[in-house]
Every structure is written in C-alpha cells, then in structure tokens.
A protein has these predicted regions:
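N-terminal-proximal low-complexity accessory segments that begin disordered
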Residues: 1-49
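Acidic, low-complexity proline/glycine-rich segments
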Residues: 5-15, 274-277, 299-311
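Acidic, aromatic-enriched beta-alpha/helix-loop junctions
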Residues: 41-57, 216-219
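Alpha-helical scaffold segments in carbohydrate-active enzymes
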Residues: 42, 134, 138-141, 145, ...
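Internal helix-loop-helix
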Residues: 48-146
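FAD-binding core of flavoproteins
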Residues: 148, 153-300
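Extended amphipathic alpha-helical segments enriched in small hydrophobics
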Residues: 296-354
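Long, low-complexity C-terminal extensions of enzymes
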Residues: 358-362
Length: 362
C-alpha cells in the first residue's frame, strides 16, 4: 500500500468508530470538532511532508522488515544516521506546525517493544517478538498512526500496583483465555490517542512478581469494544469554538491533544499480546522507551521553540523594541537553550548502539 496523504489520513479516521467524550458527552463527529480538528491537522502534516520530495529524505525510510518505503514514524532505527534523521525530522515538524504532531510516542514505543520482546523471548521461550513484528509490518504497510501508551493513573505513588486500594489504577490483566487476555484500567494523558488508528500499550514502571498481572504490553485498535476516550483539556481550548479568524485563537490551524484512555474489560487476541506477566522485563521496556522519548524532545520541542523564538522576535520588532539590550538578551538566552537541547538530541543519537534485536538504542 502506498503512503497516505494528509487528506487520506483524515478520511481514514472517519471510518473508525472511536468513542470520544468531551464535557461529559459523547462527540459523534469528532473529526470535524473545532477543538479536536487542529490536532488532527498536525498529524496530517506528518503525511503531507512525506509526500513532498524536498522532505522525503527525512520523512521516509526503507523498512528493515519488508524493504518497502515507509513513513519514518513507523520505522525501526538501524543506524546512528537513522537516530539523527529522527531528531531532524521532529524539529522540522515542530517548525511546520508550532504544536505537538503526536506520532513520536508511537515511534519510540515501536523501537522499545521491538528490542525488549526479542530479549524476553530469548529468556522465556515465548513468541512475543514474532507477534510484534507481524503487527508492525501491518502498521507500516497500511501507513497507520499508533498511540504509544505508558502512563497509568497510578493512585498512591508510594504503593506498588498490586497494593493500590483500587486495583484498576494500573492497567492489568483480569482474565486469561486460551485465545487471549482481557484487560482493565486506563492510560492517562495519552498524546494523540483520539487521532490514532491503534494503541501500543506498555507497563509504566519496573515491577516485582506480585505485580505480574500489571506487566502487560499489547496492541488494540482505537475502536475496540470496551475502549473509551475522555478528551483532555488544553489551555484556552474553547477559544477554538469562537470565530476562527479571531486574533485570540492563537495557533488556529494546528494543536496538540491528550486523552484518558479507558479499558473496560477489553479482549486482546494472543497475536497482539507482547508481554503478559513477565514482570522481569517491565523495567527494560520502560527504560528503553524513556531513552528514545528523551531523545525525541531534542527535536520536537526545539522545532516548536524555533516558532516561539521567531514570534517573540517579531513581537519585539512590531513594538520597536528589537534593539533593546534586555530584549536581545532574552532572545539570545532562548536560542542558546533551544540549540543546547537540539545538540543533546543529536549527540545521544551519534552515540547510539545496536540492541540484540538489531535496532539502535540511544
């Protein structure tokens, strides 16, 4: 299947039966809702830039699984050059949208789950890695968006998952069947969850044997039976309900979004399960994901920073203050911090190394 365009991506969302709630009510046409649509436009930009020859070198890659050309957001990094291109791609998209484009978490999850399941299978004789490779091949071939989900509501931070008064404050396995598992709980603050075709779930902390039911990783579609999303609020988000030409809207075309993703006894077939009780490997998956995601901030936040710095400089010029020393000092400091963050992203990429599975870790 060829790479999708931004418009094709938006149309693909309309075919989903995702259950989205906002302000206490279900949103039927969430794709065109004025509060949600700017975040969809941000994701669409990841598709449109992949179609542009000027940016194809950053936005696309050759799949190590199939040999086909794929969107880099579905790619497994196989060199330090891949890691560097990832950071540069993220800076580009931050510059183009001035917002969160929501696909970084899924990309980072792909690489963390790929290497962790390989070592898990090596130690336990399971077939999770095979399951994951088949899943990722499907995602690459159909050019889909995947929400990487790690953060649980947690409850009392001083207690382990199994010791919580409410056992569902961490996502867990509540039933094991011959053909799969049933999960219950939630993932909180999930970037781009509503705008995703699938969700890739990971544990949120290192765990011990008593927490085995919480050591779970799997994939499920956004409109799976029993899956509900409560849309997260953004600062000043209701301004988008006003005149779209209003100067008070701010970034009227693009935006970010998060959601509370609730799993109300969702069935996950065995083929989409990548960890189910192997608590010894929960910490490895969390640590590897965290490394990739810190690297991501060296790109995406820097791109948005470029926009913010440019806007601040323009505001100073409009007000005739561009030559004021204290204004220049602030702009210089902002630029210094922004470029330092970018340097950190590039440096940790250049120092990357291969995992046992073959993909590269920072």
């Amino acid at each position: 299947m060829p790479l999708m365009t931004g418009e094709q991506y938006i149309e693909s969302l309309r075919r989903l039966k995702t259950r989205v709630y906002m302000f206490g009510e279900q949103v039927e046409n969430w794709v065109d809702h004025p509060i949600i649509r700017p975040s969809i436009n941000s994701v669409a930009m990841t598709y449109d830039l992949a179609q542009d020859p000027e940016y194809a070198d950053l936005m696309t890659a050759k799949s190590s699984l199939t040999g086909k050309t794929i969107n880099r957001f579905t790619h497994l990094h196989h060199s330090t050059d891949d890691l560097i291109r990832k950071v540069k791609m993220q800076r580009l998209l931050g510059q183009k949208t001035g917002a969160c484009f929501q696909r970084c978490v899924g990309m980072d999850a792909f690489n963390a789950v790929f290497s962790t399941t390989y070592e898990l299978d090596e130690a336990k004789g399971t077939k999770y890695h095979e399951n994951f490779v088949k899943f990722l091949e499907m995602i690459q071939d159909e050019d889909l968006v995947v929400d990487g989900a790690m953060t649980d509501p947690k409850g009392d931070r001083g207690k382990a998952p199994h010791a919580q008064p409410d056992k569902d404050l961490f996502l867990r396995i509540v039933e094991r069947r011959p053909d799969g598992i049933v999960v219950r709980g939630a993932k909180a603050h999930q970037t781009g969850a509503v705008n995703s075709h699938w969700h890739l779930i990971m544990p949120t902390i290192a765990m011990r044997e008593a927490d085995a039911d919480y050591a779970v990783s799997f994939a499920c579609p956004s409109d799976a039976e029993g899956l509900f999303m409560v849309y997260g609020r953004q600062s000043c988000d209701t301004r988008k309900l006003e005149d779209p030409c209003s100067v008070d809207v701010g970034n009227s075309r693009f935006g970010g979004q998060e959601a509370l993703v609730v799993f109300d006894d969702v069935f996950i077939p065995n083929g989409y399960v990548f960890m189910a009780g192997e608590y010894e490997f929960a910490g490895m998956m969390v640590e590897r994901f965290a490394g990739y995601h810190r690297q991501s901030y060296g790109g995406c936040k820097v791109g948005v920073g470029d926009v913010v710095i440019g806007a601040a400089a323009l505001a100073a010029e409009y007000n005739g203050a561009e030559k004021a020393s204290h204004i220049k000092d602030k702009l210089i400091e902002m630029t210094h911090l922004n470029e330092t963050l970018f340097c950190c992203g590039i440096a940790c990429s250049a120092e990357g190394h291969p995992t046992k599975a073959g993909n590269y870790q920072i």
